[in-house]
A protein has these predicted regions:
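Short capping loops/turns at secondary-structure boundaries
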Residues: 110-114, 130-133, 148-152, 175-179
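Helix-turn-helix
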Residues: 34
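Residues that form generic nucleotide/phosphate-binding pockets
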Residues: 19, 64, 140-143, 147, ...
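Generic structural signal for helix capping and beta-alpha/helix-loop junctions
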Residues: 111-112, 138, 304, 326
Length: 397
C-alpha cells in the first residue's frame, strides 16, 4: 500500500515540477513553484508561480479548480509560505479550502518560512508529507537555494571546445566550434540567468553584445571583469539596452571609472592579492547585494581559471564539438597554473551527458567539500519520508 501511494505521489509531484519550470526566468529572485490539486485520483486544478510579484502557485491552482477542493490532496514543489509579502500567506488559503492532505517536495529555506508553513497546515489538522522528489525540487531551484542561504549568486561555467580541448585555433579563429543548435540553446540559457560574466579579453577580442536574442527571454545583466579598465568606452556592451556592471580594482584609472559611471555603468571594486587582480569571491557578495542571484560565466581561459581558483563556480556545462583542432599554441579551456598534482584537481559530481545537435554536452556540479557530499548521501528516501508521515497537530498546539 505504501509503495502504491509513493507511485501516486511521485506521479503528481512530477506534474507539479513540470508546471514550475514554466516560470523559469520570470520569477527571480523568487523560486519556481508548481502546484497540483488531486481528488479521487484525478487532477482538478493546476497552477504555477508565473511572474515575480504575481500570485503564487497555490493561488493559481485554486483559481482553476474544476470542482470543490474540500477533501483533496495538494501537491506543491515548495513549502507553502506562511507570511505576508507581496501576496498573502498561501498556507492560510490551503487551510481555508478544506484540503485533507498536502504533499511538499521540500521545505522552504527562506528564514521567513523555514517550516512555519508546514506547521501551520498541521495545526489546522491537515496531513503533511515532506520530501517527495526533493532532489528534483532542489535542483530546479538551485539558484534560489544558494542565494537565500549563502547570499551569493549561483555560478554556471559554460564553454565550447573541440574534442582535444581547444577553444580556438592558434590563429584565434573560433567561429564556430559549437553547432547551431548549441548556440541557440546558449541564448536560451542566457535568459535563464540574471547575469552573464566575461573578462576584458573577451570584449577586446570579440566585442560581443552579450544578449539573449531569444523571443520572450530577458537579457542578462552584463558583468565584465576588468582589473585595469582596458575595455574601450565604445565597446558594444556599453551601447546596448540593459544593465552593465564592471568588476575592477583600485589600480584602475579613476578618470575612466568616472566616465563609465557617467554612462550608467555600475562599478564594483575589489582588490585581489596581486595588483590589478579582481577578488572574485568578494565580488560575489557585492553582486548579490545588487540582486544578482545567478551568473552564466562565459569568459575565456584566464577568467575561468581565476573563477575556479576563487571557488565561485557551482556547475559546469561544456559543449564538445566532434572536431580536432590541435596545435601547441591553440588556447585551451582553462588557463592559469592548474593543479600541481592529480589529487589537487577539481572534481565534478552528478555528471550528466546529452547530445545537442552534433555536440556532446557534459553538465556536472563542482565538488565543494566532503561534508556537503555526505549530507547529500544521507538524505532520506521517499520510502523513509512516507513512513515518517506525521499525524496532524491538534488544534491550538
Amino acid at each position: 500500500m505504501d509503495f502504491l501511494r509513493i507511485d501516486e505521489d511521485r506521479k503528481f509531484m512530477s506534474r507539479a515540477l513540470e508546471l514550475a519550470v514554466r516560470g523559469m526566468g520570470h520569477t527571480r529572485p523568487n523560486p519556481m513553484v508548481g502546484a497540483v490539486l488531486v481528488k479521487d485520483g484525478r487532477i482538478i486544478g493546476e497552477g504555477w508561480h508565473e511572474v515575480y510579484g504575481g500570485p503564487h502557485a497555490e493561488v493559481n491552482c485554486f483559481a482553476h479548480v474544476t470542482e470543490d477542493p474540500k477533501g483533496a490532496t495538494l501537491y506543491v514543489t515548495l513549502e507553502p509560505c506562511s507570511h505576508y509579502g507581496k501576496t498573502p500567506p498561501c498556507a492560510d488559503l490551503v487551510v481555508e479550502k478544506g484540503v485533507d492532505r498536502v504533499v511538499v517536495a521540500m521545505e522552504d529555506p527562506n528564514p521567513l518560512v523555514a517550516g512555519k508553513g508546514i506547521r501551520k497546515l498541521k495545526e489546522a489538522g491537515i496531513f503533511v508529507t515532506v520530501g517527495i522528489m526533493e532532489e528534483e525540487a532542489r535542483k530546479l531551484n538551485e539558484v534560489f537555494l544558494k542565494y537565500i542561504t549563502q547570499h551569493k549568486p549561483f555560478v554556471l561555467y559554460k564553454a565550447a571546445m573541440s574534442l582535444d580541448g581547444k577553444t580556438a585555433c592558434h590563429t584565434g579563429d573560433s567561429q564556430w566550434i559549437s553547432c547551431e543548435d548549441s548556440r541557440e540553446e546558449v541564448h536560451v540559457l542566457r535568459g535563464c540567468y540574471k547575469g552573464i560574466m566575461v573578462g576584458a579579453g573577451t570584449i577586446l577580442a570579440d566585442n560581443p553584445q552579450l544578449t539573449a536574442r531569444t523571443e520572450g527571454m530577458i537579457d542578462p545583466v552584463r558583468i565584465i571583469v576588468d582589473g585595469h579598465l582596458s575595455v574601450p568606452l565604445k565597446a558594444k556592451v556599453f551601447h546596448e539596452e540593459g544593465e552593465n556592471i564592471i568588476l575592477t580594482t583600485t589600480a584602475s584609472d579613476e578618470g575612466k571609472r568616472k566616465a563609465l559611471s557617467d554612462m550608467g555603468v555600475d562599478i564594483i571594486m575589489t582588490d585581489g592579492e596581486e595588483k590589478g587582480s579582481v577578488d572574485l569571491e568578494a565580488a560575489m557578495t557585492g553582486l548579490a547585494l545588487k540582486g544578482i542571484d545567478s551568473i552564466l560565466l562565459e569568459g575565456g581561459a584566464t577568467l575561468a581559471a581565476s573563477a575556479f581558483d576563487a571557488g565561485i563556480v557551482d556547475k559546469v556545462r561544456i559543449y564538445t564539438a566532434p572536431m580536432i583542432i590541435g596545435g601547441v599554441s591553440a588556447p585551451g579551456l582553462i588557463g592559469g597554473e592548474g593543479a600541481p598534482t592529480i589529487p589537487k584537481a577539481i572534481r565534478l559530481r552528478d555528471v550528466q551527458t546529452q547530445m545537442t545537435g552534433k555536440d556532446l554536452v557534459i553538465e556536472a556540479y563542482v565538488e565543494k567539500e566532503a561534508k556537503e557530499e555526505k549530507a547529500e548521501s544521507t538524505r532520506p528516501t521517499d520510502v523513509d519520508l512516507l513512513k515518517r508521515e506525521e499525524e496532524p497537530c491538534s488544534q491550538g498546539s
